[in-house]
Amino acid sequence: MAAYLDAVGKTPLPIHIGMLAGGGTVRTAAYGFEPGPLPPEALREVHRLLEESLFSGALGISLGLGYAPECFYTTQELIAALAPLLDSGVPITVHMRQEGAGVVEALKEMLTVARALRTPVHISHLKSIGKAYWGRYMPEMLALLTRAREDGLDVSCDLYPYTAGSTQLIHVLPPEAQEGGLDTLTQKLRVPEFRAAMRERMQTGTDFENLSLLVGWENIDVSTVTREENRRFVGRSVAEISDAEGVDPFDLTFDLLASESCAVTMIDRITANEDICAALRAPFSSVISDATYPTSGLLHPRVYGNCVHLLEEYVRRQGVLTLEQAVERLTSRPASVLGLAGKGRLAVGMDADLCLFDPARIHETASYAAPERCAEGMDYVFVGGVPVIAEGQFTGAVNGSVLRR
């Protein structure tokens, strides 16, 4: 972590950059993609790497319990792995173990972790995946978080203001598919017995985030690939491609992942506007983009439009938030979660990281079909008091810095 942050700090940056220490990265470094409890020596290495990352300036710890290898932790094993955070005040951000049928139990698990470690826990992109659960679980989750806060726990959440998400296509598979790592998975996807086992799990399984069952292949679009022969699939749903190619959607997915060495991303339509609105209204919520930056194919429009989309859609059009509430969820709330004392507010002595815009003109131009379009109406952006955007144009200024805890 120290070497990486030092290298980034030597790079001209137009914006500030901070890092969380990846819980999966740390476990992989200590024990690979192997399942089961960590042996004592691997657990000690996890502790050492966490402590080293925090000492080097990591803003917190990021967990992805729906992904391998972190999915292999039991709750108590996870608490043991995170022991260096006890009473530390260091935030743990978490993609929970489930966001579909088991999302409420997954949230209760993280409240157990918060109580055990007595350190802040922040739920990443809070949502309920699957039509059967839209409007059903979000009120219960927000009530659980509210009660936990009333009981003295430092817990919070964030969300992205879109009904579609984006991640790696391998995550339509059950987590145990990744035992041994992605190279091993690529080989296993060519084995008939493994494919049959995966198909059976995906047709019936409710103990993982089973996207093909929760939202259907028609709501899972291929967004990036690396091989030229597969580019015809980009921007189309697995169901559409399956029909056009005359191939079963499971076989199509297995074949595509194997041919691409698992380097395929997807855009998946997974959640409901009513749940977004409910989470936005929670005073302990922040708004994030959850954006990734693939070098080819289709981006998610949130890469270019996330913050403007919030202001245009949920302030001006739907009236879910006031302008002041929306700005708070983009600024002082996330700054507070990450312990960035100099960020997020307009006050004497605070860092001059500012945006100047006309609320009436703010407009997202990016779409799912054409995502690489800059938003309109964000006239000026100042980083450390230096204009990086002026009259809507990039100035070339590079006044960003590395943020360390």
Predicted features and spans:
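C-terminal cap of metal-dependent C-N hydrolases
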Residues: 191, 278-284, 289-290, 355-401
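Divalent metal-coordination and catalytic microenvironments
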Residues: 17, 23, 57, 95, ...
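Generic structural signal for well-ordered alpha-helices
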Residues: 2-5, 50, 78, 82, ...
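Acidic, glycine-enriched loop/beta-strand segments at the rims
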Residues: 264-276, 322-327, 335-371
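Active-site neighborhoods of metal-dependent hydrolases
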Residues: 14, 20-25, 29-40, 46-67, ...
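Catalytic alpha/beta active-site cores
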Residues: 1-14, 29
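Divalent metal-binding pocket/active-site signature
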Residues: 52, 58-110
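Active-site proximal loops enriched in glycine and acidic residues that flank catalytic Cys/His/Asp
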Residues: 65, 96, 125-127, 159-161, ...
